[in-house]
Amino acid sequence: MSCTGKTVFRGAEVGEFRCEILGVLENTGPKQSVILARLSGGPLEETGVMQGMSGSPVYVGGRLVGAVAYSFPFSKAPIAGIRPIEEMLAPAPPRQARSAATDPFDLAASLPARQEIEMGTSRLVEISTPLWLSGFTRGAIERFAPRLRAAGLEPVQGAGGGRTRPPAGSPPPLQPGEMISVQLMTGDMSVGADGTVTHVDGRRVYAFGHRFLGAGETEMPFARAEVLALLPSLNTSFKISNAREWLGSITADNATVVAGELNRKARMLPVRIRVANAAPPRQTSSYSMEMVGDRLLTPILVQMAVFSALEATQRIAGISTITLRGKMLVRGGEPLPLSNMYAAELGTPNLVSAAVAAPVAALLQSGFDSLRLAGLELDLEVSNQKRQLQLDGVWSSKRTVRPGESVDITALFLGESGAELTRKATYHVPVGAPPGPLYFTVTDGPSANLSEFRQFLLTPPRSPEQLRAFLTKLRPNDRPYLRVWRSSPTLQVQGENLPLLPPSAGAALLQSAAQQSNSLVAEIRMDPAPWLFSGSRTIQVEVKE
């Protein structure tokens, strides 16, 4: 059976190609089928099925039957799988809310598996979505490309990416076969994902013929795109494209379709990154972007943007220390501060970018409407010195102490080139303190945060207040911390510590799902310094009656 299809081969003009339906693959998924067809005409004999063709409409006798959605990698013939239009237009089945991934940056583990159909030694797979990135360093793209490819996205460095530009005069109505670019980030760095429009019904737009991320209900702007050139490849050819004028917002990203609405504005998050050199002359580079507020995609975009900004303005190999000062803007509430220092001989930008993206992921994946991320502001200062001190020793002024008395704890830190620094803290043993061993641990910020991180993973915050408290209490490592504790257990229920419970209540909770940990008696923040403190040591002092 003969059929025709529509797609863009050059510029913004929709061209036609021919096809021959070979048959129908039934039950390739739950109530899903795939129409198998051989494509021909235009450049397809040379290029085969291209990335960016996803969603190209196919007609039989003038009737829309489906959209190009599948291809055979490394195939010598342009054979495609066509998604039936009925599956694209059907209401999406109810979806369970996406849960946070164990690794918030592992897109592939967090998303539904992409559909593959085994056919002997070949595979019919969903056409990968080309992800155009502009304004990013080559190193940033190479570092994050494996994660993106695992999620079915093909990162491509280009000039167009997610930038949009207004057309000359009034733009024409959007037509089936035209190319669109889903705008994930715009500005000094930009990201756009390309596909083709299958069907337009009033203000509703249906495209791709398969999922983009499988996000379900979503909010992502999209623009018209133009094709600059076609690049044939033995693996999968693709269209080199440019984003043009804004058109509307993608509102649904389901297994069989990416659907949106024309003239609908999508909410975007403003992101500002400023990178300064600590040594004179103090040069500063600033980056301003807007990005989507997706709970899984945004942390990766933030990580890529921070890494690229650091790599573009500073060397990433060799010793460096990076100081972070910033804040996460929250809709209708006080900003959440970001403050820390990072030092390493290699890979400091990777440490910083991951550290920034982690609280962004926690905020976006919490699901609390009163803590919706509204923007991100980051100031990064880079030094070519390793300003790091290692804990060398801890001692106390007394071996034994009585209730009502004080004990001094001193810590010695050593660094490169003979750097030496001491920090002292005084703990007052309260009247009525029970006898027995009392432990004093001098530690760095990340080590002190471990117990909170464990609690966060075991019992995620049950309220916006708990999440805000968790994020604001994270300790920076520009100072050491003195933690005073006993070995008797304390209890945690729904993320809250319950110290000093009556024996009957404690016994009941010990038999429930409550979490147990050592009893933290006090924590003292020791004096800060423009250094990164690292290391942890514990000493014991005996409390006598």
Summary of predicted features, one role per range:
Residues 1-545:
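Terminal presequence/propeptide segments associated with secretion/organelle targeting
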